[in-house]
């Protein structure tokens, strides 16, 4: 390869990446997921568009695995362990039982539609059986979904790849060897994938944490060290026949939930690297497909995609979540709809091509078509479906910016900046009147781009910018402090007519609003009553019905319900009650 060819490759690569970034700005205007736009750029530049011929499947496999490792590492770093209290076991059930059921249901229909053997149909089902972390992390961000739904979908997408990879590799081996029966050794293989992946991920994350916190480097090198360490964990786990995808996700989870040096620098750079990984991966996958090859299979492939979206995924979700009573029908419906397929199925579809199986090109084209339909149909309608099924909650007021204060190696101090608009209740109040959360301090006050030297008597005005020092766990309290109403920062349109304290006794609440206890313990706290009704770990937005009234979890303090909203039937509204 001469210098001219190398320069041409650099130019083409840079133009494609740049075009993807620029065109992605149309995503929000058109309501189309960014990943679809990037795929489209790759397809337009490919053999049926710009004429770039790319059919190197091993290279696509390499790029795809590298990109997914970076994306999963970034996803793990941003996942809060606290969310596991409501979603760990349901997500694992979806990642195992759900994938198995989806594979079986999809495989049977695929075999019938394309006149294949059952085992070939099941291979198609396995290839497209798992949700994609890149698609889920990208499309769920900023949608305001309740914690149970968000955590379940994110943990599922980060942990269901081992099952899909295991099923795909197993079925390829069976087809290649002519084997038609299953053996108990397959279960051992699956347990080994999960076991080694889990141990390597947790152990590798702990070792990386010790290394980052003990070694002194230039600030810009810590993110690179974390990425390198994540890739080491990923590759070593694969070499030991474990799940590298699960391992790198857990490695990020450990690093993201412990005090770590240069935390904000790591997260900031990983965000950019994850975006680059997504762009590069979907560009390569777009180049890899030949669009005119999709036309002959378009009708049956569309039928298979719709079967997955409307039947296979919902049935698998209902079955997998059957033991978990906390999930309402609306939440199950939304989780069913967000069975987003992305890069993983396309990468898994490369496996049969590399193994030289008959009909391997059909498997690849089918996987690509299903991914395209999934992103266009499910990804585009996600915000609308969230509103329809009422799984969103009002967002907490957030600072306009936040930055780290690295006063020591593992410092978790941050600087939060709040801009005070005309709707803020604290306008006209003196600083001494603000009940700041314990452990926080106002560090600076800017007014009309000028730094003031505030005192307790300084009165806040519209447009002021407050700089507050605190920790991440102070954000909910600070958000309420700088909300739109004095002690009514909660969105009453969502939570109800009144908001009650969670420790209010049920007997007092019933007497106040003329409700019947029906044998319930009058001394029972309202929070405990709602927890029992929910049937699992509650989250903000959970609702129950009692005597025609709707009771909504409004504020959580860890695992404890702190405030509850109550909405009465239309035309009825009791007295002031315990209005807060």
UniProtKB/Swiss-Prot annotation:
<feature type="transmembrane region" description="Helical">
    <location>
        <begin position="34"/>
        <end position="54"/>
    </location>
</feature>
<comment type="similarity">
    <text>Belongs to the monovalent cation:proton antiporter 1 (CPA1) transporter (TC 2.A.36) family. NhaP2 subfamily.</text>
</comment>
<feature type="transmembrane region" description="Helical">
    <location>
        <begin position="193"/>
        <end position="213"/>
    </location>
</feature>
<comment type="function">
    <text>K(+)/H(+) antiporter that extrudes potassium in exchange for external protons and maintains the internal concentration of potassium under toxic levels.</text>
</comment>
<dbReference type="InterPro" id="IPR016169">
    <property type="entry name" value="FAD-bd_PCMH_sub2"/>
</dbReference>
<keyword id="KW-0813">Transport</keyword>
<dbReference type="InterPro" id="IPR006037">
    <property type="entry name" value="RCK_C"/>
</dbReference>
<feature type="transmembrane region" description="Helical">
    <location>
        <begin position="6"/>
        <end position="26"/>
    </location>
</feature>
<feature type="transmembrane region" description="Helical">
    <location>
        <begin position="292"/>
        <end position="312"/>
    </location>
</feature>
<dbReference type="GO" id="GO:0005886">
    <property type="term" value="C:plasma membrane"/>
</dbReference>
<dbReference type="Pfam" id="PF03471">
    <property type="entry name" value="CorC_HlyC"/>
</dbReference>
<feature type="transmembrane region" description="Helical">
    <location>
        <begin position="217"/>
        <end position="237"/>
    </location>
</feature>
<keyword id="KW-0812">Transmembrane</keyword>
<keyword id="KW-1133">Transmembrane helix</keyword>
<feature type="transmembrane region" description="Helical">
    <location>
        <begin position="362"/>
        <end position="382"/>
    </location>
</feature>
<dbReference type="InterPro" id="IPR036721">
    <property type="entry name" value="RCK_C_sf"/>
</dbReference>
<keyword id="KW-0472">Membrane</keyword>
<feature type="domain" description="RCK C-terminal">
    <location>
        <begin position="402"/>
        <end position="484"/>
    </location>
</feature>
<dbReference type="InterPro" id="IPR006153">
    <property type="entry name" value="Cation/H_exchanger_TM"/>
</dbReference>
<feature type="transmembrane region" description="Helical">
    <location>
        <begin position="108"/>
        <end position="128"/>
    </location>
</feature>
<dbReference type="GO" id="GO:0015386">
    <property type="term" value="F:potassium:proton antiporter activity"/>
</dbReference>
<feature type="transmembrane region" description="Helical">
    <location>
        <begin position="240"/>
        <end position="260"/>
    </location>
</feature>
<feature type="transmembrane region" description="Helical">
    <location>
        <begin position="269"/>
        <end position="289"/>
    </location>
</feature>
<dbReference type="Pfam" id="PF02080">
    <property type="entry name" value="TrkA_C"/>
</dbReference>
<dbReference type="GO" id="GO:0006884">
    <property type="term" value="P:cell volume homeostasis"/>
</dbReference>
<feature type="transmembrane region" description="Helical">
    <location>
        <begin position="86"/>
        <end position="106"/>
    </location>
</feature>
<dbReference type="InterPro" id="IPR038770">
    <property type="entry name" value="Na+/solute_symporter_sf"/>
</dbReference>
<dbReference type="InterPro" id="IPR023729">
    <property type="entry name" value="NhaP2"/>
</dbReference>
<keyword id="KW-0630">Potassium</keyword>
<keyword id="KW-0633">Potassium transport</keyword>
<protein>
    <recommendedName>
        <fullName>K(+)/H(+) antiporter NhaP2</fullName>
    </recommendedName>
</protein>
<keyword id="KW-0997">Cell inner membrane</keyword>
<keyword id="KW-0050">Antiport</keyword>
<keyword id="KW-0406">Ion transport</keyword>
<feature type="transmembrane region" description="Helical">
    <location>
        <begin position="57"/>
        <end position="77"/>
    </location>
</feature>
<keyword id="KW-1003">Cell membrane</keyword>
<feature type="transmembrane region" description="Helical">
    <location>
        <begin position="162"/>
        <end position="182"/>
    </location>
</feature>
<dbReference type="InterPro" id="IPR005170">
    <property type="entry name" value="Transptr-assoc_dom"/>
</dbReference>
<feature type="transmembrane region" description="Helical">
    <location>
        <begin position="334"/>
        <end position="354"/>
    </location>
</feature>
<dbReference type="Pfam" id="PF00999">
    <property type="entry name" value="Na_H_Exchanger"/>
</dbReference>
<dbReference type="InterPro" id="IPR036318">
    <property type="entry name" value="FAD-bd_PCMH-like_sf"/>
</dbReference>
<dbReference type="GO" id="GO:0050660">
    <property type="term" value="F:flavin adenine dinucleotide binding"/>
</dbReference>
């Amino acid at each position: 390869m001469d210098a001219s060819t190398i320069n041409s490759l650099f130019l083409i690569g840079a133009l494609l990446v740049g075009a993807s970034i620029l065109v992605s700005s149309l995503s929000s205007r058109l309501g189309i997921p960014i990943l679809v736009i990037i795929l489209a750029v790759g397809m337009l530049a490919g053999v049926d568009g710009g004429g770039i011929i790319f059919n190197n499947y091993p290279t696509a496999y390499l790029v795809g695995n590298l990109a997914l490792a970076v994306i999963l590492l970034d996803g793990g770093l941003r996942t809060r362990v606290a969310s596991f209290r409501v979603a760990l076991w349901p997500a694992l059930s979806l990642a195992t039982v759900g994938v198995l059921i989806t594979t079986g249901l999809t495989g049977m229909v695929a075999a019938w539609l394309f006149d294949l053997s059952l085992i070939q149909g099941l291979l198609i089902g396995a290839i497209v059986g798992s949700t994609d972390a890149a698609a889920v992390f990208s499309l769920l961000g900023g949608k305001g979904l309740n914690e149970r739904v968000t955590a379940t979908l994110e943990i599922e997408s980060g942990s269901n790849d081992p099952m899909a990879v295991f099923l795909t590799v197993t079925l390829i081996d069976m087809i290649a060897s002519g084997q038609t029966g299953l053996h108990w050794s397959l279960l051992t293989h699956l347990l080994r994938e999960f076991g080694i992946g889990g141990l390597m991920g947790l152990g590798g994350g702990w070792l990386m944490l010790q290394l980052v916190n003990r070694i002194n480097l230039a600030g810009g090198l810590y993110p690179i060290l974390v990425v390198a360490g994540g890739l080491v964990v990923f590759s070593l786990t694969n070499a030991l026949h474990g799940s590298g995808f699960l391992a790198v996700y857990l490695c990020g989870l450990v690093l993201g939930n412990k005090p770590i040096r240069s935390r904000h620098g790591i997260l900031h750079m990983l965000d950019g690297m994850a975006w680059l990984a997504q762009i590069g991966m979907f560009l390569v996958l777009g180049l890899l497909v030949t669009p005119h090859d999709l036309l002959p299979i378009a009708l049956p492939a569309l039928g298979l995609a719709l079967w997955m979206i409307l039947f296979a995924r919902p049935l698998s979700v209902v079955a997998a979540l059957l033991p978990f009573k906390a999930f309402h029908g609306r939440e199950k419906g939304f989780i069913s709809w967000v069975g987003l397929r992305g890069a993983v199925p396309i990468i898994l579809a490369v496996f049969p091509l590399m193994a030289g199986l008959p009909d391997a090109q059909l498997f690849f084209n089918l996987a690509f078509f299903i991914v395209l339909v999934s992103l266009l149909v499910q990804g585009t309608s996600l915000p609308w479906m969230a509103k329809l099924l009422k799984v969103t909650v009002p967002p907490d007021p957030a600072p306009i910016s936040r930055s780290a204060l690295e006063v020591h190696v593992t410092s978790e101090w941050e600087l939060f900046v709040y801009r005070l608009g005309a709707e803020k209740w604290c306008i006209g109040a003196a600083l001494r009147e603000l009940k700041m959360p314990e452990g926080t301090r106002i560090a600076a006050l800017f007014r009309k781009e000028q730094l003031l030297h505030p005192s307790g008597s300084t009165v806040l005005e519209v447009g002021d910018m407050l700089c507050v020092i605190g920790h991440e766990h102070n954000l909910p309290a600070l958000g309420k402090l700088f909300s739109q109403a004095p002690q009514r920062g909660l969105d009453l349109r969502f939570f109800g007519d009144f908001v009650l304290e969670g420790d209010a006794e049920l007997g007092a609440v019933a007497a106040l609003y003329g409700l019947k206890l029906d044998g319930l313990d009058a001394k029972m706290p309202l929070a405990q009553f709602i927890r029992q009704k929910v049937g699992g770990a509650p989250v903000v937005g959970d609702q129950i019905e009692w005597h025609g009234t709707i009771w909504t979890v409004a504020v959580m303090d860890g695992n404890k319900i702190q405030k509850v909203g109550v909405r009465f039937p239309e035309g009825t509204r009791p007295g002031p009650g315990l209005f807060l």
